[in-house]
């Protein structure tokens, strides 16, 4: 049962509406009572991205069909940010985040690499293009990111070795197969594992040694023989 005195974070099994974060952050009180409507909205938004009429932030058409390949909805308590940095994407607090890539089948050396989630090249390229459309929110986000780019980079460099060590140890005991991305967020002195996905479907994979990467087989059709 949800406590309407608390804030919550919501997503589908594959999509969180991060770029419009206000829809992913459900605030205590009335919004908690209406949480189902927020879930329906981001689920609908993910489905719409699979439409042939879909366009990205730059106006380019393209069907993104992998965003909503799940019926799962996720609700967890919101982690109140301790960071003093400002927000982008309509309410997403900028904090130190690290993306680790692991091979769950390699128990001896599972860590494939660790990268800064707020990658400067990716962020500036994306926000610069969106800003060209004249979107004032994009101008705001681009300006804020540029102001704190070095701060985020230094936070990443100061924590990546410790996080890499912890994730390496964790990966040795995971009951999983295949290669995965694992996202870790720093909040004050605490670190949270906040998301995982198949490595092959994850951004920033191009920064990992391609010789260590392998495709994961996805079972799109359920195996019903076990019920016979």
Model-derived features with residue positions:
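Conserved protein-kinase catalytic-loop segment immediately C-terminal to the catalytic Asp
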Residues: 101, 183-186
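Active-site nucleotide/adenylate-binding loops and adjacent lid/helix of ATP-dependent enzymes
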Residues: 1-97, 101-111, 115-168
């Amino acid at each position: 049962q949800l406590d309407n005195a608390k804030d919550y974070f919501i997503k589908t099994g594959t999509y969180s509406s991060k770029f419009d974060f206000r829809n992913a952050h459900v605030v205590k009180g009335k919004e908690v009572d209406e949480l189902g409507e927020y879930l329906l909205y981001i689920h609908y938004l993910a489905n719409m991205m699979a439409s042939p009429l879909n366009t990205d932030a730059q106006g380019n058409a393209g069907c993104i069909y992998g965003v909503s390949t799940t019926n799962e909805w996720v609700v967890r308590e919101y982690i109140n940010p301790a960071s003093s940095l400002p927000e982008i994407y309509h309410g997403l607090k900028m904090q130190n985040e690290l993306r680790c890539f692991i091979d769950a089948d390699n128990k001896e050396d599972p860590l494939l690499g660790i990268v800064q989630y707020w990658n400067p090249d990716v962020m500036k390229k994306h926000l610069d293009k969106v800003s060209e459309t004249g979107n004032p929110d994009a101008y705001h986000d681009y300006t804020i990111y540029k102001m704190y780019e070095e701060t985020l980079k230094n936070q990443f460099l100061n924590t990546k070795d410790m996080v890499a060590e912890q994730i390496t140890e964790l990966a040795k005991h995971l009951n999983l197969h295949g290669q995965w991305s694992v996202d870790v967020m720093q909040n004050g002195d605490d670190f949270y594992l906040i998301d995982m996905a198949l490595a092959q479907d994850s951004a920033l994979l191009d920064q990992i040694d391609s010789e260590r990467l392998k495709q994961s087989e996805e079972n799109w059709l359920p195996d019903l023989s076990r019920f016979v």
